[in-house]
Amino acid sequence: MTIQSLIVTIGSGGLVGFALGLLGGGGSILATPLLLYVVGVTNPHIAIGTSAVAVSVNAYANLIAHAWKGHVWWRSAVIFALVGTLGAFLGSSIGMLIDGQRLLLLFGLLMAMVGLLMLRGRATAPRAEHHQTVLRMCMKTSSVAILTGAASGFFGIGGGFLIVPALIFATRMPTINAIGSSLLAVGSFGLITTLNYARHDLVNWTIAMEFIVGGITGGGLGTLLATRLSASKHLLNRVFGLIVIAVAIYVIWRSWASLVA
């Protein structure tokens, strides 16, 4: 491991942490492409397993910062995370059976669709009370969580770009609270994915630790910026959508090129 590669890996982790802190997701979207195309990991499944470690730890670290600022709706977040981990385990088990480049191609297509939906925006939802988690909301949150967890595990990602809109859909919480609350699920889904991939020796622990070092620093900066932008939910949605689409285009191009080569 050279100094240059160490700097590149830590810097890449910083970008991942910044995205997690700012958007409550996007970290895992950025992590796998960065590991493959910048850091130099050659096996897509090892890149996915390794990114899951860093994304999980960074998500939990950023969760603390968001919780300190009062952004987390704990009951909805806990229900979503607990139920979603069941889906994440099943999804990750299936994902490991699929060719890595085909998995990345599907992942890129999914990102593009979600990014376009985020750019379109959504109708303003009636605000739910912070202290009310009625039975209907719990059931709605749980059903969305298990589907989101399955998708997150299948693609080997934390799934923040799915979890944020899913939380808004299920609970009608404001965007900044969905961002903060999503981090519990991002961390939990990443942890389950990590353990599942590690059982098959598909995690590079050295690179993962370097990612974490950069990610914690970047996450702090992202959280500060998220607080400043909390009053402009539409801006957050559009920034989120643009990042997802940009990364999607690159992932689709690279994975398609590998498949047809």
Curated annotation (Swiss-Prot):
It holds the Pfam family TauE. The keyword Transmembrane applies. It is a multi-pass membrane protein. Induction: Repressed by BigR. The keyword Protease does not apply. It is found in: Cell membrane. One of its GO terms (cellular component) is plasma membrane. The chain crosses the membrane at residues 6-26, 45-64, 78-98, 99-119, 150-170, 175-195, 205-225, 239-259. InterPro entries: TM_pro_TauE-like, TSUP/Inactive_protease-like. Keywords: Cell membrane, Membrane, Transmembrane, Transmembrane helix, Transport. Belongs to the 4-toluene sulfonate uptake permease (TSUP) (TC 2.A.102) family. Probably part of an operon that comprises bigR, blh, PD_1893 and PD_1892. This is Probable membrane transporter protein PD_1894. It comes from Xylella fastidiosa (strain Temecula1 / ATCC 700964).
